[in-house]
């Protein structure tokens, strides 16, 4: 099992010893707070793109095919995270740590993308420009995401992994909820410019907070500050691409890893439904306003945040790591199948709310267990690339499902979309079972 390079509460040395704020490796509260804030910010592009803007576009008459294409293109950068990881494992400004310079740069690029959105302020009729702006925002956010994931694998002790995974994604869903509610209300007033400016302000405030903590004692807070590269950074940072690529491919071409990748990709069908199909179902079929759907998305995100904060650890303890993943996936597949067969008899919104909540909560409880497992099988020296590969496959599947979901709806209606989700979840279930998730004999000790 991977062990963190340092332990919490280690004594400060060097230039950082005079600072009042601890390094992330020294303080568990600092680690958790920083990672929570960074993951909260990852909720900004997701909440804006997959909830607020999709509801807004649906209210303006966009078809399921157009919504699916918009979401698929806007989320596409999340499937390219492998290349981000390669860059980060190869290049960094070492005096600021392995990941911090990338994180702060990504935050400022997110602000720039939101300011560009505010300046251009495309209307709902200019869906191509809106898609391009959301693509740019997602691209900036992926650098932040990969850097944070790599930092988590790098500095979080193994006994904190399950807890930190729950906190990470609970924070992301809190960010999605906040963004959905704020952006939904502002877009209802018809002002994309103000929406983008408000979100840019939120990202800026969070960036200031994150900039207060260095990764390890003695490192620089800013490029112009005093400090030097830590021994851990110098030891782990690669000086060439080939060792990174060869290490990733050695870890990839194993039966259980390939099965795990395919299974995780199949489970993403549930999120893709929420991204691309649910907005038109709620706004156009059920007659909700765009603000009502955005508020619903915010509420569901908060419920998911609470569920993944509370449920994964006890489920893992009671059921074991494998069944803690299998059971939620089985329940999600049954929920989607039931929705498919009962959809013609739905009398209003209650059935949609219940089904959407159950499918998303169950799929994400399973996802937390899977992500925790992938962190265990990652090598810290190439963590950004290796972990990014797992997440890139997930996000590519999510983007792909979203892109074609509109065609499924137009060909067979919403029951067909629910049935497709159920089918993909069953396939994912079989693959996850064959991948032997939770089998400790598959975890390799990594030498840095």
List the model feature ranges, each with a label:
Residues 80-97, 187, 307-322, 409-410:
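Helix-to-loop junctions at the C-terminal end of transmembrane segments
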Residues 323-370:
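C-terminal transmembrane helical hairpin of 12-TM major facilitator-type secondary transporters
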